[in-house]
A protein has these predicted regions:
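C-terminal luminal/periplasmic domains and tails of membrane-associated envelope-modifying transferases
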Residues: 8-179
Length: 179
């Protein structure tokens, strides 16, 4: 690289990927720090009770998965529902590495996008960088909708943040720019 320091817009983009919630966010305890890995989700895609959604991903850091956070979750019918997660290695899809569940009560939400929903595993799940995993998302409600944060660019300058960097595509399912 010809640069002596990191370019500020690239560092700002990296900061956003670590701190601005997408639809699905992995919290990986790595060494002395937590690495937050956002995962893309199709905008407006309903997860139905009889059709679990399988989300394939590859961790960008070695460490222990302690929790998964949905940026915004809501049940389309606005009824209380249970949401269950199952994590498996892609090489052994029938062997669950961990399970977690959480209750979603859409009746208490003022935000039309829904509310954050946190899933904590009973035990931390070791993840290996560059190994493939599958996260299965299931609901017993009408239709589960997940959404990431909405990013607003208040400028006509054509270099709005965040940039595509480190394998992340901010508008490819991580964030919305339609709200």
């Amino acid at each position: 690289s010809i640069y002596l320091r990191s370019e500020t817009r690239m560092e700002a983009s990296r900061w956003m990927f670590q701190n601005v919630p997408s639809a699905v966010n992995l919290s990986i305890e790595a060494d002395d720090a937590t690495y937050n890995q956002p995962l893309p989700m199709p905008q407006g895609f309903p997860i139905l009770p009889d059709a679990p959604y399988n989300l394939a991903f590859v961790p960008k850091a070695d460490g222990n998965l302690t929790e998964i956070i949905f940026g915004y979750a809501r049940d389309e019918a606005g009824i209380p529902a249970s949401v269950e997660l199952t994590l498996a290695s892609a090489s052994q899809p029938d062997l669950a590495l961990g399970r977690a569940s959480s209750a979603l009560d859409s009746t208490l939400m003022a935000d039309p996008r829904g509310a954050p929903l946190t899933f904590a595993f009973d035990e931390a799940i070791p993840l290996s960088k560059d190994q493939s995993y599958t996260l299965t998302i299931e609901t017993n409600g009408a239709a589960l909708l997940l959404q990431g944060s909405a990013i607003v660019n208040e400028t006509d300058y054509d270099w709005g943040l965040p940039f595509r960097i480190d394998g992340y595509d901010p508008y490819g399912g991580l964030y919305s720019n339609e709200d």
